[in-house]
């Protein structure tokens, strides 16, 4: 069953005719994703990659019945693109763009309340249900249909977890990059809740990092959840100094809050299995499942 997306998902691309939109749409089509068109204002009526181009998301949805959109738009315009997709009632919106101003995202976050849209990202690799639908910039070939749900704040560490769970034969049900910005659309808690309710997902890998309290919130949720599944977690930034941003905009220990130590302690107290090295994620999960 997987979560969020599957082979029936109809996907449009905002920023379709740009270099990033073109390249990653080609990759998605080659993977087998059901791409049905794209949006570039001023280029409506043309075709691109043998798909129709529309001026607005409203028009694209009306003509294609799209229920998902991926956004490859520069930071200054990305929030407006998300708002347009929300206004058009697109169900799943994946925003890849890094560097969107925080105040822009606060407006987006407010618009999401009570809407029909789930936003993944921004500043994320996207979402993939292996063998069915790839929305984002992740390398499709490392994925394998399987039983592990993966959710991560880091793109490249997601790929590590994917490659390792593929190598040990477990595969993935769905993989979600929630993004590394301080304000994002979907949290660890929301993703873990969906994975816990999904029959095909037998276990979960959660990859966090320093900054914020998303991992602590996830630990509280896991502790209180009536549904239990094996969960392995890796937290990046154990040696990170305070008050220094480490890559992602949200990866900063500020005011003594958001350290890896705090996150690890919270997750361990919730019964999550911790791996100290990203190289051991797949093996740790396999060993955990073999013990059950």
From Swiss-Prot:
One of its GO terms (molecular function) is succinate-CoA ligase (ADP-forming) activity. Pathway: Carbohydrate metabolism; tricarboxylic acid cycle; succinate from succinyl-CoA (ligase route): step 1/1. One of its GO terms (cellular component) is succinate-CoA ligase complex (ADP-forming). It catalyses: succinate + ATP + CoA = succinyl-CoA + ADP + phosphate; GTP + succinate + CoA = succinyl-CoA + GDP + phosphate. Its EC number is 6.2.1.5. Succinyl-CoA synthetase functions in the citric acid cycle (TCA), coupling the hydrolysis of succinyl-CoA to the synthesis of either ATP or GTP and thus represents the only step of substrate-level phosphorylation in the TCA. The alpha subunit of the enzyme binds the substrates coenzyme A and phosphate, while succinate binding and nucleotide specificity is provided by the beta subunit. PANTHER family: SUCCINATE--COA LIGASE [ADP_GDP-FORMING] SUBUNIT ALPHA, MITOCHONDRIAL, SUCCINYL-COA LIGASE SUBUNIT ALPHA. This is Succinate--CoA ligase [ADP-forming] subunit alpha. It comes from Rickettsia typhi (strain ATCC VR-144 / Wilmington).
